[in-house]
A protein has these predicted regions:
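Beta-strand-rich interaction surfaces with strong enrichment in secreted/lumenal proteins
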Residues: 53-55, 82-87
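N-terminal edge beta-strand
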Residues: 32-60
Length: 123
């Protein structure tokens, strides 16, 4: 192969390489905290929504319960550790907790004797 042919091939290869573009996928931040499991609860005229919901989350991930209520009650989370929150007759109440032991966790209203949800907490 002559020097002229070798030079032509090299130029052609470099020209083709310059025509391509590389698009990288945006980096994901694996250290970002997980989105919390959020449950919106309404208590109105003795009716609770939702009831007996089945949900899932993982150990130590945040769980948020948002409550709009027209009556006072106690929200009790049967978990390790246990959590209790006083519900007032008002809108926009937010309660946050996490669970440190895997298993089934019941979230209940004590005065109305209703189970809002059972949360399956995975390791």
């Amino acid at each position: 192969m002559t020097m002229r042919a070798l030079t032509a091939i090299t130029i052609a290869v470099l020209a083709c390489a310059g025509c391509t573009t590389s698009t990288k996928a945006p980096a994901t931040d694996s250290s970002a905290p997980p989105a919390p499991l959020t449950v919106s609860v309404t208590i109105k005229n003795g009716v609770v929504t939702p009831t007996n919901a089945t949900l899932q989350t993982r150990v130590a991930e945040p769980i948020v319960i948002r409550v709009d209520s027209d009556t006072a009650d106690e929200l009790h989370v049967h978990s390790t550790p246990d959590h209790s929150f006083e519900i007032e007759p008002k809108s926009g109440q937010t309660f946050q907790f996490s669970v440190s032991v895997p298993g089934k966790v019941d979230v209940e209203l004590h005065k109305l004797k209703k189970t809002i949800a059972t949360i399956s907490v995975q390791p």
